Amino acid sequence: MADVKIGFEVHVQLDTRTKLFCDCPTDYEDAEPNENTCPVCTGMPGAKPLPPNEEALLIALEIAHMLDCEPVLDRPLYFQRKHYDYPDLPSGYQRTSVPIAVNGELDGVRIREIHVEEDPGRWEPSTGRVDYNRSGVPLIEIVTEPDMRSPEEARDFLRRLMQVLRYSGKVKGDGGIRVDANVSVEGGARVEIKNINSIKGVYRALRFEIQRQLNLMKHGREVRRETRAFREDQGTTVAMRSKETAEDYRYIPDPDIPVFEITEDLWEKAVARAPEPPHHRARRMAEEYGISLEAAEALVTEREWADFFEEVVEKAPDDWDIEFIDQWVRKEIKKILNKKEMTFREAKITPEEFIELLELVREDKITRQNALNALWEAVDSDKSPVEIIEENGLLKVSDEDRLARVVEEVIEENPQAVEDYKSGKEEAIHYLMGQVMRKTRGQADPEVTMRLLRERLDSDG
């Protein structure tokens, strides 16, 4: 197997109300082109930026904590101008902070450093049009060490990272992910693949690029240190330019942005606001509740799903076993949501309503199927499962006199099934059972019904 080293620079938009250095709104998706702009985010001469958006810094620190990073505390920090010439960068430079947190780790991949920077605008090369609504939206940049050894490892890491970022609740849903992937093979030159905008795209780009470099080496050709672009339609990478160094970007401190510090108070505030990271939460839940790590990992794929599970466990009677709750929360309700293409965030049922339903199941007052039917309707309804059960009369019918009358009707209406049963065909009684269930709309107690059917059929000899 080839000796491969892969590292990432991952960029994701932070969900703030205003941009990083001005008061323009960050909600640009539904805006007209260049509607949410001002002289600062369009790089007008003489325009002076505001001090850095503190909420953006705070969110970045929350995410740094979730990635087990150390804050760069109590020392002067500043924003730099990273110079390059592109139509979507009106000032000719991008403002990016020096590292605000370092030395993190996620699933065995070291996080070298975290920065905050401003997003450039949107340029459409085919038309030449530039929309600066996005210009100045705050980004977090997460830089890893080259610790991944295959496209599969890289893909798994990005999936986990995006899970952590979504868990924070502080990244923009429409901002997506933009990845610069650095890859070297067999100790050769490092090649950067710029601006890949999906995890699937990163995986495909890495597979192609690794094979490209191996093919060059096989034929004795040099792998050049360069920057390449991923062509999604072809699944290939193409050369853009020779690989830049820090000197090429002509980094200088931005004289218009005041120096700032990350104080202990600011860091403690970020830590207090940050949710428990999903990878930590899964380990804790497995240990605390005695469920498998695999089950816990499934629950934490959605923050609201894990929240729901833990709240049900907390509020349910003490004598309920975890296996029962796990079966209904992790499997049954999730199965329904998947079929309806819903997330837990969209589900309308509350933990209290769910517990009421499970109480009926545990007390054997409703059949499992009718409980599932009520749950199916409740997840996207304003009615609770119990309200649906009461409105539709879905509780079990255990009254033997009533059930005996229904059994008698079914036997009279299905003489062929009765004859089949008496000739030894056991499946016939299950057919008759189904007819009783149909007449009672699934409310008949299965055990009582089966006993009454056998007693009635066997009594005829």
From Swiss-Prot:
GO BP: glutaminyl-tRNAGln biosynthesis via transamidation; translation
UniProt-listed Gene3D superfamilies: 1.10.10.410, GatB domain, N-terminal subdomain
Subunit structure, interactors included: Heterotrimer of A, B and C subunits.
Enzyme Commission (EC) number: 6.3.5.-
Pfam families attached to this UniProt entry: GatB_N (PF02934), GatB_Yqey (PF02637)
Name recorded for this polypeptide: Aspartyl/glutamyl-tRNA(Asn/Gln) amidotransferase subunit B
Gene this protein is translated from: gatB
Homology family: Belongs to the GatB/GatE family. GatB subfamily.
Function according to Swiss-Prot or TrEMBL: Allows the formation of correctly charged Asn-tRNA(Asn) or Gln-tRNA(Gln) through the transamidation of misacylated Asp-tRNA(Asn) or Glu-tRNA(Gln) in organisms which lack either or both of asparaginyl-tRNA or glutaminyl-tRNA synthetases. The reaction takes place in the presence of glutamine and ATP through an activated phospho-Asp-tRNA(Asn) or phospho-Glu-tRNA(Gln).
Annotated source species: Methanopyrus kandleri (strain AV19 / DSM 6324 / JCM 9639 / NBRC 100938)
PANTHER family tied to this protein: GLUTAMYL-TRNA GLN AMIDOTRANSFERASE SUBUNIT B MITOCHONDRIAL AND PROKARYOTIC PET112-RELATED, GLUTAMYL-TRNA(GLN) AMIDOTRANSFERASE SUBUNIT B, MITOCHONDRIAL
Source organism, top-level taxon: Archaea
Top-level class of the enzyme under EC nomenclature: ligase
Keywords noted in UniProt: ATP-binding, Ligase, Nucleotide-binding, Protein biosynthesis
InterPro entries attached to this UniProt entry: Asn/Gln-tRNA_amidoTrfase_suB/E (IPR017959), Asn/Gln-tRNA_Trfase_suB/E_cat (IPR006075), Asn/Gln_amidotransferase (IPR018027), Asn/Gln_tRNA_amidoTrase-B-like (IPR003789), GatB (IPR004413), GatB_C_1 (IPR042114), GatB_Yqey_C_2 (IPR023168), Gln-tRNA_amidoTrfase_suB_CS (IPR017958)
Catalytic activity: L-glutamyl-tRNA(Gln) + L-glutamine + ATP + H2O = L-glutaminyl-tRNA(Gln) + L-glutamate + ADP + phosphate + H(+); L-aspartyl-tRNA(Asn) + L-glutamine + ATP + H2O = L-asparaginyl-tRNA(Asn) + L-glutamate + ADP + phosphate + 2 H(+)
Any one GO molecular function term: asparaginyl-tRNA synthase (glutamine-hydrolyzing) activity
